[in-house]
UniProtKB/Swiss-Prot annotation:
Keyword RNA-binding assigned: no
Gene: murA
Catalytic site: D121 (proton donor)
Main localization category: cytoplasm
Family under the similarity heading: Belongs to the EPSP synthase family. MurA subfamily.
NCBIfam families per the UniProt record, alphabetical: murA, PRK09369.1
Protein name: UDP-N-acetylglucosamine 1-carboxyvinyltransferase
Length: 434
């Protein structure tokens, strides 16, 4: 188990580029299974979850070639269907949550799929019902093999239908869309997720020959086609990294420029940080964050305490609440952080309290943060990263703290952040991997 040793108290300065979006690229790679032709994907981040999925594709018989620094080509002309029933395949799926998005493409093109319960962050219950019910509505049969603890999915023919999703699940919508593009007839999906990464998937599928309309809305209409073809696709910058860097600059009172952020796809993320009192400027497609000695949390118009809560797009992504919580510890004022979508993502706050933060954990979903206004510097400490997003929040806290901190289990951070210590050290951080 690797660790970071962080020497806190150093200001950052310079430019930093966000990596390609993890949550987009996992969908895009799975979608390459929908055609026997070559698909080239650019701006792929070099992170653990993505690399594991790429290796899984190779193991499945997909021809994968690295064509550039961050570019890969995928050609799924000779998929090994027998391998999909092997214990090795199922074991790998169990450690990678993104593997659930293999179901839609596999059932659509090959008529069957097998998958174990996928892994990923331990951040609470993450239901698969939306995936399964949606694909069942298209005509697939699902069975659970208790002996092997796997899901078996099969379909002689998928047929278009109308469905209303019980939740606007991003991965659930992606899975259903990937199945529906090769189904016979028309499919309509109401209460579909509409975040930028899902829009990117739909646009790529249309370039491959799919017929999807309603992109960027919560009502998608899909006319099934006989086959899809190859294409090129470029992944968006990771909005979670962009938000993490904004928070990092505020906590360390640093001046940085975040380059090529695809500002129009950030939604309310910039405004949410402004509510915490953080100044930032859009400069073309870059974000400039000036150094601030203090930042004051806004109140609501009636004077009540500010609440920052997550919601399905175009609401605030839940992946940034951990960052906003830690940033609030050094703000002037108080804020209620309300994590609605997952019930155990706030359970890392005890580590921040040990560092000197003033936080009241109300319940598994809510925490009140009383900011120090930089009047009291957090203390360095020893901590373990429980998941990707808590890990980066703890790293931000350690970078602003007085003294030395150690973060263990940084493999969690590596799952979502590419060479994070190298990129941060290049602009003034002091982080050592041991």
């Amino acid at each position: 188990m690797a660790s970071f040793v962080i020497e806190g108290g150093h200001r950052l300065s310079g430019e930093i580029h966000p990596q390609g979006a993890k949550n987009e690229v996992l969908q895009i790679i799975c979608a390459t299974l929908l055609t026997a032709e070559e698909v080239t994907v650019n701006n792929i981040p070099d992170i653990l979850d993505v690399n594991n999925l790429i290796q899984l594709m190779r193991d499945m018989g997909v021809t994968v070639a690295k064509t550039g620094v961050d570019s890969y080509s995928f050609k799924a002309a000779n998929v090994d269907l027998a391998y999909l029933e092997s214990d090795n395949f199922l074991k790998k799926c169990s450690s990678l949550r993104g593997s659930v998005m293999l179901i839609g493409p596999m059932v659509a093109r090959f008529g069957k799929a097998m998958i174990s319960k996928p892994g990923g962050d331990k951040i609470g219950r993450r239901r698969l019902d939306t995936h399964f019910i949606g694909i069942q509505n298209l005509g697939a049969d699902f069975t659970y093999n208790e002996e092997r603890e796997i899901y078996e999915i099969s379909a002689e023919e998928l047929k278009g239908t109308s469905m209303l999703l019980d939740e606007a699940s991003v991965t659930g919508t992606a899975n259903i869309v990937m199945a529906a593009v090769l189904a016979k007839g028309k499919t309509t999906i109401y209460n579909a997720a509409c975040e930028p990464y899902l829009q990117q998937l739909c646009k790529m599928l249309n370039r491959m020959g799919a017929k999807i309309s309603g992109i960027a809305s919560n009502l998608l209409t899909i006319e099934g086609v006989e086959e899809l073809h190859g294409t090129d696709h470029t992944v968006l910058p990771d909005m979670i990294e962009v938000g993490s860097f904004i928070g990092m600059a505020a906590m360390t009172r640093s001046e940085i420029t975040i380059k090529n952020v695809s500002y129009e796809n950030l939604g309310i993320i910039p405004e949410s940080f402004r509510r915490l009192g953080i100044k930032l400027e859009q400069r073309g497609d870059d974000i400039f964050v000036p150094a601030q000695d203090c930042y004051q949390i806004e109140s609501f118009i009636d004077g009540s305490i500010m609440t920052i809560a997550d919601a399905p797009w175009p609401g605030l992504t839940p992946d940034l609440l951990s960052v906003m919580l830690v940033v609030a510890t050094q703000a002037k004022g108080s804020v209620l952080i309300h994590q609605k979508m997952f019930e155990s993502r706030l359970f890392f706050v005890d580590k921040l309290i040990d560092m000197g933060a003033q936080i009241i954990l109300c319940d598994p979903h809510r925490a009140v943060v009383i900011g120090h206004n930089h009047g009291f510097t957090l203390r360095g400490g020893n901590m373990t990263s429980p998941d990707i997003r808590a890990g980066i929040a703890l790293l931000i806290a350690a970078m602003s703290a007085e003294g030395i901190s150690r973060i263990h289990n940084i493999e969690q951070i590596d799952r979502g952040y590419q060479n994070i210590e190298g990129r941060l050290n290049a602009i003034g951080a002091r982080i050592t991997r041991i």
